[in-house]
A protein has these predicted regions:
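Amphipathic helical "hinge" segments at domain boundaries
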Residues: 80, 88-155, 165, 260
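Short beta->alpha connector loops
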Residues: 111, 146-149, 169-175, 195, ...
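Short, well-structured alpha-helical segments in soluble
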Residues: 151-162, 284-294
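Short beta-strand segments enriched in small/hydrophobic residues
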Residues: 59-61, 97-114, 225-231, 243-248
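Bacterial carbohydrate/catabolite-sensing allosteric modules
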Residues: 1-39, 84, 131-135, 183-391
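N-terminal helix-turn-helix DNA-binding module of bacterial transcription factors
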Residues: 1-101, 390-391
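Short, Asp-centered acidic motifs that coordinate Mg2+ and/or phosphate
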Residues: 164-167, 299
Length: 391
């Protein structure tokens, strides 16, 4: 399994495409010998291994691939010869060229990499995805999304990088330029938590139902003034209280669904604060604004655990008791050791399994399967940060 970082455009590329000699490592020169078998001067090749094992090159190739009706003794003889010659296996580039595939899955992380990797949600989903792709001998190319206010800019890698399948994390808007760019190239795509689109596989969770469940939990505790701290509405990534006009149509699907979950419980939020990213400091900023006024809410539903933990820290900073003065709930189910002794009330999603599910869809696509939609369940975990509404 190889995990390729964001490509370094300062690295010079080969002036010409690889030839069969480049791929197989056949470099002219005085041959060395192994038991009477001529060897390449720089490194052993599959042909050298086949000669040493006294089998055909095709048989040696099948011995490494694990395919075909090859006797166990023959396979072992090939591997023994390879070990003695120091041959590590067929060149991956050559194998990719023969298959007509790059062996690479492009993963668009949905944000600047420096910000995305501060969120355990991203890393846990990637763990599940990369873990499954590793069993398929596929590499991963990480591609950041445009992080500025424009919705028309996409990373040049999306237009040029070799990839067999693309995975788009945190799908964004239905008219995403990322999806449009991948469609132009004809690259099969798996979308994580985005709007259903023709020809695109989608892996989602019942986040709308999960938010409805945690909101009803707060209603059962007697809360009536319930506010919301949200993920970004769109590429503008604003930071502040929402106007009625902006609330009307969030472009990003995750934000839209989780807001809808509050309404499904019969609640119109007392206030909605949009944050530019799922980070603790943005939750703390939102918490200070929402909890400083005279008509502060008695409960706050946050669209991520990192945002919720920031609100908890802001409440403590303002001298408010959680949950006696204000109840706070999140979404994700990640570890938040800095909140101890409190345990956040949250909606738990199966992060690693979500990534593995995406990996299985990638596998299915490479096998010729049609696009499909899979939705994973979520569960409410009641912690110590929610309690009865203050009198």
């Amino acid at each position: 399994m190889s995990l390729c970082g964001y490509a370094d455009r300062g690295v010079k590329q080969p002036a010409k495409p690889p030839t069969s000699n480049d791929v197989d490592g056949l470099v002219p020169g005085p041959p060395a010998r192994h038991g009477g078998v001529p060897l390449s001067s720089q490194r052993p090749t599959l042909a050298d291994v086949a000669a040493a094992a006294k089998v055909s090159v095709s048989t040696a190739s099948l011995a490494f691939s694990g395919a075909g009706p090859i006797a166990a003794t023959t396979r072992q003889r090939v591997h023994d010869a390879a070990s003695e010659l120091g041959y590590a296996g067929p060149n991956p580039l050559g194998r990719q060229l023969r298959r007509g595939r790059s062996g690479i899955v492009g993963v668009v992380v949905g944000d600047a990499l420096s910000r995305a990797f501060r969120d355990p949600v991203t890393t846990q989903v990637l763990d599940g995805l990369v873990g499954h792709l590793g069993t398929l001998d596929l590499g991963v190319l990480l591609i950041p999304s445009a992080s500025g206010p424009t919705t028309t800019t996409i990373d040049p890698l999306l237009e040029s990088a070799a990839m067999d399948v693309a995975v788009v994390m945190w799908g964004g808007a239905g008219d995403s330029p990322v999806l449009a760019g991948l469609a132009r190239r004809g690259i099969p795509t798996v979308l994580i938590e985005g709007r259903l689109a023709p020809g695109v596989s989608v892996v989602g969770i019942d986040d709308r139902g999960g938010i409805e469940q945690v909101t009803r939990h707060l209603l059962d505790l007697g809360h009536t003034r319930i506010a919301s701290v949200t993920l970004p509405f769109d590429h503008e990534r604003r930071d502040g209280l929402m106007t009625t006009q902006r609330l009307a149509d969030p472009a990003w699907e995750i934000t839209r669904r989780r807001l809808a979950g509050i309404h499904d419980a019969g609640v119109t939020p007392a206030a909605v604060y949009e944050t530019p990213a799922s980070l603790v400091e943005h939750g703390a900023t939102a918490g200070r604004v929402l909890l400083s006024g005279p008509d502060r809410p008695t409960a706050i539903v946050c669209q991520s655990d990192l945002l919720a933990s920031g609100v908890v820290l802001a409440a403590r900073e303002l001298g408010l008791r959680v949950p006696q003065d204000v109840s706070i709930a999140g979404f994700d189910g990640i570890d938040l050791p800095w909140l101890a002794p409190d345990v956040l009330t949250t909606v738990v999603q199966p992060l690693t399994e979500k990534g593995a599910t995406v990996g299985r869809l990638v596998e299915d696509i490479l096998a010729g399967a049609e696009p499909e939609h899979r939705e994973l369940p979520v569960t409410l975990r009641v912690g110590t940060t929610t309690g009865p509404a203050p009198a």
